[in-house]
Amino acid sequence: MRGAAAVQLHFVPGRSRPWLRRAALGAAALAVAGLAALPLCAQGPPSPAQPAYAPAPAASVYQPPASSAQFNGGVARGRVQPGVMALSLNAAIRMGLRNNLAVLLSSTASEQARAQRWRALSGLLPKVQASVGDEETKENLAAFGFSFPGFPQIIGPFRVFDARGYLDVPVLNISGIQDLRSSDASQAAAMHTYQQMRNLVVMAVADQYLLASADGSRVTAAQAQLRTAVQSLAQAEDMYHAGTVSALDVVRAKVQRDRERQNLIVRRDDWAKQKLALARAIGLPSGQAYRLAQPIPYTPAPSMTVNHALAEALRMRPDYMAARESVRAAQLAVAAARDQRLPSVDFSGNWGTIGNRINSNHPTFTLAGQINLPIFSGGAIHAAEIAAHARLRQAQDQASDLRAAIGQQVRSALLDVHAARQQVGVATQARRLARQELTLARDRFRAGVGDNLEEVEAEQEVAVAEENYIGSLYSFNAAKIELAQALGVAQASYRSFLEGAK
């Protein structure tokens, strides 16, 4: 296989996997090129070399399974450490690049492409083999139809000792050379695909970390809202005992307190489960306690124009590089199929000693040259050419589609960053106003102007405003890391996108 596919995935946005909205998964371009090893001859003249018209393996397109479970899974390494481990975003990404299942599977595919390249190379390299044999024989000539008057029917036993080395050298094989070049391009495509997978893992781990950080902020906000509800209940009870409010105000405050208690329980559960998901994605040992040690504050996104972003993406995206290498591999596969019509030249020989026993051996050798000229292959070469041309068109179409998809992804990511930045501004203003509303409602209730219904409603508005702010901040940071992925620089530049220029 010497082709590669760029599989475009689309997922419905959701809390669990929002980073997969427009992730372009570059498929591994695995080469399965190579010539069969020439058979090694026994004593005597070498066996004929493989015919030149033997069809080379056709290039094909390999599409690995694009499962989000690969990014959510990881291979746990090490042992559980005592105490609570402090986990920063940088440490989480380093662990993810080392332990995440998607990276490990892509690395294996890259090694397979490397093995296929060696297989193609082996068809062009000399083959050397040695053998030592000692044989004792007794034959019945009559069994083979030989009968001579005065000549014994039974001959032997006689002994033959032979020690010999064999050499097979493919002198000229144009199709095999093109096959090797195609495998080189496929190996390069596989390496680019591996780098693309690392970028996707950086985005996946960063998103899991951002989700865990957002859930932690939700727990903190829920705790603050519970404290506010408890204080409001205490104030309502004091005023009830003083005879300034009715029992309804006390009951309403208790309902609000219990609502905040329930909300805190749910938030803590979500946070704990999200931390488990992050731990699994980066390969933390099961049961390892940790805390998030790196808050992700609001920092402006890098400023760039659409044209600059598109040019950067086409220059840096590993999956686009893999697609171009796949086209090149397919072009060379077409040449390899066509060049099977050309003659090939092989040289073979052996040298050794042979005799009745070791001390009576005499050296012998055989040298042979062979030109293989395909005259009629039964349509095998024509079939290989048709298949190679079809896969070339497929690789070209996939590369063109990926180029268009990159343009869409970059534009969409820039739109998301712009919209999320505006959402953060609106959410910040709304949170400030909600807190101001709560202060005014509390003062009115304390002054006896009205009941605590306004205060309870204001507390709910504060909760909504806090949730909107946390969600908008997460969306903004997720949009920035998505932009880094769309540009092809997620692994190299995620810190500058999330933490700002330093």
Regions found by a protein language model. Give the residues of each.
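Acidic, low-complexity, intrinsically disordered peripheral segments
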Residues: 9, 13-22, 41-58, 138, ...
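Bacterial N-terminal signal peptides
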Residues: 23-39
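A small-residue-enriched
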Residues: 44-69, 74, 94-172, 193, ...
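A detector for short, charged/polar N-terminal pre-domain segments
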Residues: 76-83
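Sec/SRP-type N-terminal targeting helices
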Residues: 104-105, 121-122, 157-160, 171-198, ...
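Short segments within alpha-helical structural elements
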Residues: 122, 259-284, 420, 431-489
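Periplasmic alpha-helical coiled-coil/stalk elements that build and connect Gram-negative outer-membrane
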Residues: 192, 198-312, 416, 420, ...
